[in-house]
Amino acid sequence: MAASTFSAKCTEPRWVAQSRPKSSARSPYDGRTSKLAFLRAPRLGCSARRSRNLCVITNVASNQKQDLKEPFNQEDDAPDVFIPDPVSIASSIKYHAEFTPSFSPEKFELPKAYYATAESVRDALIIKWNATYDFHEKMDVKQAYYLSMEYLQGRALLNAIGNLELTGAYAEALKKLGHNLEDVASQESDAALGNGGLGRLASCFLDSLATLNYPAWGYGLRYKYGLFKQRITEDGQEEVAENWLEMGNPWEIVRNDVSYPVKFFGEVVTGPDGRKQWIGGEDIMAVAYDVPIPGYKTKTTINLRLWSTKVAAEEFDLRAFNAGDHTKASSALKNAEKICYILYPGDESVEGKTLRLKQQYTLCSASLQDIIARFERRSGDQVGWEKLPEKVAVQMNDTHPTLCIPELIRILVDVKNLSWEEAWKITQRTVAYTNHTVLPEALEKWSLDLIQELLPRHVEIIKMIDEELIHTIIAEYGVEDLGLLKQKLKEMRICDNVELPASVLELVVKEEDTSPDEEVIVALEEEEEEEEDQEEGEEEEEEEDQEEGEEEGEGEGEDKPTDEENDQVIEAVTAIDKVSFDPDPKQPKLVRMANLCVAGGFAVNGVAEIHSEIVKEEVFNEFYKLWPEKFQNKTNGVTPRRWIRFCNPDLSKILTKWIGTDDWTINMEKLSLLRKFAYNDDLQLEWREAKRKNKMKVAAFLKEKTGYSVIPDAMFDVQIKRIHEYKRQLLNILGIVYRYKKMKEMSPEERQRSFVPRVCIFGGKAFATYVQAKRIVKFITDVGATVNNDSEIGDLLKVVFVPDYNVSVAEFLIPGSELSQHI
């Protein structure tokens, strides 16, 4: 499309000014005042029309459904909210094109149109965002905090205006300005904050939390280059930095007034008051960047707070810089900034492992300091720390945020001066853990020596937690059977291959000292001495025999151990020798993060029913026997707004038409109403037409991205996820090779009778240092190059690897897929 131009008086948009409240307590976000009423979204299955009644939300961390109460109505206090129309929206876009430019002002081309449009939408989000925050502050509700190393968000523009119910208005406004909404939206880069299902789950959770009006925030890291941008060449996968922030991110608001210190290395000393102090080392600052997350058909807009890292200005060595040593002058800054350079830096080296651990601790430390600061502010002059679990729930998405547990204890004990017992009880009631894998080798383990060097105070705390756990295990199983105890400790301890604490050794040694077999052992030793004496000679032996006879006569009634008893004693001695609690010097000392999560939190959940059962019966079976009340299931889902309503509009229209309502977008159980129409010819025809239309989009997309042509009438067989041996892309492609081999063995007529045309689509990234996964990518692309150029096979079989798979690619592929491979 040719570049558009426009001219208008660029003043602040009318709808922004009219939406701004007249008076309120100061909002912590942008300095503006806000007292917008917090309007309740419809309950699941209810009408889309919303009440203006305020709601109180309680019981956030409960397993039960959230109760929405309506204690009062402040309709009179609520400002008159102005709903933007296309004219007002066009004015807003013009305003931002002029006054918040990301490009030169001469032309209103697509990139500039996108940034101006995004800024316009952000204005609408901030109004609701401030109102949500103010309401949560006023009501002092319990708040959930979701910590994740990944957020795989996808593009934000269409999702935001869809949730705001402004898609049509923005499409019309952009049309007035000479652009198409889809073309403008295509200019947006996916936020490079995640890679796989872990990050997509986190993003879907935030969307659903906002839609259901839960008081919740997300916390993550603001990666400058994401994981990487994937290119597919004749050599397979190549990685390049994904500079998604090159032109800035219009959805984020930098919060330079919100920053927290984060410390690494150093040493632990005991202060004059007897309390531990972590001093020295390397200090950085974590700075907040906020991203509004709007709910669907609700005024609720929650927050995703991302941390970026830097150092204080005084850390810049001006003297070294002026002396010409520029590397030394900026070394502190570079060390801080690289923490947030990329997601999952290679960990083959010690430096890589250290950087990953720095990332995890930065997320935990900055987030907890922020959470506690908010709790203290809401508590006023009297802070009751015992009430922290009643106001705060911290959910750890996988084991990456595990350091939340020792960090929360450190803050409570070292900074807030609570006792160990108080801090430990509070932590156990505040933190919860989501498990994502049942593979034992995939459960995170960190070198104790590495953590000791980087986070010395946390190692002390982790060892104390380990000691608490050991005493709990001993209380459950006792010390009578040392073999059983050793087995339980081997499976359950947090510190693996580490010496037992002194308090535990006392119990074990005491049990060994008071063993009932001790008298029998002494008798056996005496008998061995007698046998040695017998070898000295016949005369001495006879004399000794006479003496022994006399002694036996004197001590008549005392029994010597029988051979059978002696054998039992030998077995007992051997068994005790085998029960050694000493660490193996040949094996590394490790911290098992998953065990720390289970011991340190109040809940552990799997992400599917079968997964949760495996977690209970296999992965953490010993913990389940000890604390069955901790284990629960939370089946993963996806937001139907992004994944059906917005990316598959043709199917959405069909669902709404036949169900009779669009309530399925917030209550998927409504889709069950389609069952009665399953054999309706009209529905089936509409469904097939929508699917074929989506497949034609996929075919055009594949042609653009890979150069391969596919027919939309073939079956689209899709496997899109990160490349890993346990994800079994190798098994899939070997099956395709077998199919190809069978086709080649047949005549053309036999092939046509035996096979349905099939397009096998792969997508996903292999980690840069994961050699075997990269070989799988190479193998898939090589098979594709062979099969796709075989004129004998033609359209019967195609193999396509889509480069740089992300959410936006998935939004193309999923609506057109017919078989999704999960093997």
Regions found by a protein language model. Name each.
Residues A2-R20, R26-G31, L36-E539, D545-I823:
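A conserved ligand/cofactor-binding region detector
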